[in-house]
């Protein structure tokens, strides 16, 4: 049994980490969150110590590491806001623990370079939650593409719309410097999945950017990808809005729907199982999507020219 600490317990993704820690037979001993609205802990690890200040949390896990008798923290799971991931990963490694971090691992490629040095200095590894890679449908599609030796280039339309209310624009998520923007917030797992299956980026074009919407084109080794991401519920197809739906997700591959709506419930647990078996995703697995999102963030939109997503034809200018 390993001892875990968790940074960021009040967010929506943290319970999946708590569940994964429990289902893999391990123990959560310490939690850091600036909010004390973390009653969800009672469902999984009611004996875990809660800290509201980073300094006291840091001191606590350091002291545990010196006590011996199996009390040291072996892994620190990180579910904090995007811009804090780098610092919290470093905190874990400084305390002789492995880090398990939610995506996006970091916001910029130079953060990855620094963390590689930190791994070498401490001898501890940084693991990464990329659960879509473990989805059965994604694995099956990757096997199909890998087996196709024809060199065919596939045409893909990625559309993801998830409505967000006014609260979003008052939170850290709306701050580009803290979140990385819309592509990092809601697009990162798709970009990772597509490059995992269809290969490296050869061209990255941005057609449209606003606070709530972004769209562009990616030329991958084995695919041409038109992508559209939005937080504006008005972009959800009208028939779905009439049903009260606020989210729409679609991936078309050569005009055929790629279906992977189900099978998400245990993916974090599977990710933890692989990490504990020494087979988890690492820093190198983050570089593609970090590079994509960083480039999009720093690139001006070119407008509706070239291979742009069809949803842009009707978007409010």
Put a short name on every predicted segment.
Residues 28, 47, 73-76, 150-153:
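Local beta-strand N-terminus motif with an aromatic residue
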Residues 50-100, 104-116:
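Beta-loop-alpha module in the N-terminal Rossmann-like domain of NAD(P)-dependent dehydrogenases
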